[in-house]
From Swiss-Prot:
One Gene Ontology term of the molecular function aspect: metal ion binding
Name of the encoding gene: csa1
Cofactor: Mn(2+); Co(2+); [4Fe-4S] cluster
Protein name: CRISPR-associated exonuclease Csa1
Swiss-Prot/TrEMBL keywords: 4Fe-4S, Antiviral defense, Exonuclease, Hydrolase, Iron, Iron-sulfur, Manganese, Metal-binding, Nuclease
Domain of life assignment: Archaea
Keyword Kinase: no
């Protein structure tokens, strides 16, 4: 998730070696034709379709239930927030400072973090600092590398070389019956979508990549053949990444569309799909389903 120019080149080489055989009927730009087309006027959020195997959380939300936000969800939200703010700060400082180098960037990032620290609890601050320093170290070194290789770069070109991706990339999902979306990271040069997860692996995380790919295809009419799924763990000492390149295959696209149709059906008809057999205690609605 902390992409550099070298990372981008390695991913590009991997992608070139993999097959890209996607049925045109399953491209997002075919949103006006089945199976991508949806008759429903309801818009469903991709994030609401990844936690419950029966999608009962969608039903409960329609009925007005509010789930409990547990520790794991809060920690995941913190990591996502610090990640997005940190990457944005790197870009902002490069844009705002002429002839900035890695050492200056480290100083500025340190000052920026301590201005954020006042809004965090002590435990949150520990994990946030580890992640913030991780981001700072990577892109301070990358800034020095780019400056040593290129001269007379515009600030915009410098930013694009140091941080070659967007965070919280907005996507309009309305043509697919989805809400407005935000992709954790988007590398336009490849193109590649990336999602950061902080819990354990779920197959539905791969399905969500298919949803984002379809939505981008519907809006921009460019093919998205791969996604990057990264499980990020932040401890008190380090940041660990476990990332996997995911082909956005026909089967993955079809499964996502089936899941979307089911979610919309639940929203439109208000039919309870029943309690899942694989409920997890950290689910927001666990106490609703298991009082």
């Amino acid at each position: 998730m902390f992409f550099t120019h070298s990372d981008m080149l390695l991913l590009s080489k991997r992608i070139k070696k993999l097959p890209k055989n996607v049925d045109e009927e399953l491209r997002g730009w075919n949103w006006s034709e089945p199976p991508v087309y949806t008759r429903s006027l309801s818009q469903v959020s991709i994030s609401e379709m990844v936690y419950c195997s029966t999608l009962r959380n969608v039903y409960l939300k329609v009925k007005g239930f509010r789930g409990e936000i547990g520790r794991q969800i809060l920690q995941g939200s913190l990591i996502h927030t610090i990640y997005a703010i940190g990457i944005e700060a790197i870009k902002r400082f490069i844009y705002s400072r002429e002839s900035i180098d890695g050492s200056t960037l480290r100083t500025l990032m340190g000052d920026e973090f301590y201005s954020l620290l006042k809004d965090l609890r002590e435990e949150e601050g520990i994990y946030a600092k580890v992640l913030w320093d991780h981001i700072t170290n990577i892109y301070s070194a990358e800034l020095d590398r780019v400056r040593s290789k290129f001269t007379n770069l515009t600030r915009d070109s410098l930013v694009s070389q140091v941080v070659p991706f967007y965070v919280e990339f907005p996507v309009d999902g309305s043509l697919l019956g989805l809400t407005n979306l935000r992709v954790d990271a988007f590398i336009p040069h490849l193109p590649l979508i990336a999602e950061m997860k902080t819990g354990k692996y779920r197959y539905t995380h791969e399905l969500s990549l298919a949803g984002y790919a379809l939505a981008i295809e519907s809006q921009y009419e460019i093919p998205i053949d791969f996604g990057y799924l990264c499980y990020v763990t932040v401890t008190e000492k380090e940041v660990k990444n476990n990332c996997k390149l995911i082909p956005i295959s026909d089967s993955l696209r079809s499964e996502f569309l089936d899941m979307r149709d089911k979610a919309q059906d639940i929203m439109d008809k208000g039919v309870d799909p029943g309690i899942a057999k694989d409920c997890e205690s950290d689910c927001m609605f666990y106490k609703v389903c298991h009082p």
